[in-house]
C-alpha cells in the first residue's frame, strides 16, 4: 500500500493528477495494490473531504482513503467548530463506508489546529476519551477499516505510549465486538 497526503481540490485534481490516476487504475485493476489518499487539513476544505470525493470519482477498489483523526481535529479547531459539528459537514457516512480503507488513530490535545509534537498525534489520555473518538469514526461507517495507531512518543526506544494506545484500542474493540 502507498499512503499519499493529497493537497488538491477536485477542480485542481481534474486538471493534474486524475489523468495519471486513471492510467494507474487500469494498471492496478485485479491486483491487491492500493493507493491510499490521506486527508489533510486545508483552509479550502470546510464542507467536503477532497480525498473521499477523489476516490468516489475514480471508483476503484485500488484507490481508497485514509482518515487521520488528528487532521480532523486540527481542521475542526481551525474553523472553531466542535468535532461533531465539523464532521457533519465534512464527512458523508455512505461515502466513508465505500471509500475509507484505513484510519490513523491518535489524540489531539490542543484546540488551535497547530501541530506540535507534544499535543498532536499523541496517546489518548484515558479510555473514555479514546472511546469517544472511536465511536465518532464508527458512527461514520469506519468500524471495519484498518485502524493504525499513529502516536508521537516521548521515548521512541520504549514505544510505551503506542503500546498503551493499542491496549486501550484493543479494549474498545473487544467491548464493542468490532
Residue ranges and their predicted role:
Residues 19, 55, 60-67, 73-178:
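Histidine-acidic metal/acid-base catalytic patches
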Residues 1-64:
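Active-site acidic/histidine proton-transfer and metal-coordination neighborhood
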Amino acid at each position: 500500500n502507498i499512503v499519499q497526503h493529497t493537497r488538491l481540490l477536485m477542480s485542481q485534481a481534474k486538471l493534474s493528477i486524475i489523468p495519471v490516476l486513471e492510467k494507474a487504475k487500469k494498471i492496478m485493476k485485479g491486483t491487491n495494490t492500493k493507493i491510499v489518499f490521506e486527508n489533510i487539513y486545508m483552509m479550502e476544505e470546510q464542507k467536503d473531504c477532497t480525498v473521499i470525493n477523489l476516490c468516489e470519482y475514480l471508483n476503484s477498489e485500488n484507490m481508497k482513503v485514509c482518515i487521520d483523526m488528528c487532521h480532523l481535529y486540527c481542521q475542526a479547531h481551525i474553523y472553531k467548530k466542535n468535532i461533531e459539528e465539523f464532521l457533519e459537514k465534512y464527512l458523508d457516512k455512505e461515502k466513508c463506508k465505500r471509500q475509507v480503507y484505513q484510519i490513523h488513530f491518535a489524540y489531539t490535545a490542543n484546540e488551535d489546529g497547530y501541530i506540535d509534537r507534544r499535543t498532536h498525534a499523541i496517546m489518548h489520555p484515558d479510555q473514555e476519551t479514546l472511546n469517544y473518538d472511536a465511536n465518532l469514526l464508527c458512527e461514520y461507517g469506519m468500524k471495519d477499516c484498518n485502524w493504525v495507531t499513529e502516536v508521537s512518543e516521548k521515548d521512541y526506544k520504549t514505544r510505551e505510549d503506542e503500546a498503551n494506545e493499542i491496549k486501550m484500542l484493543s479494549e474498545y474493540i473487544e467491548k464493542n465486538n468490532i
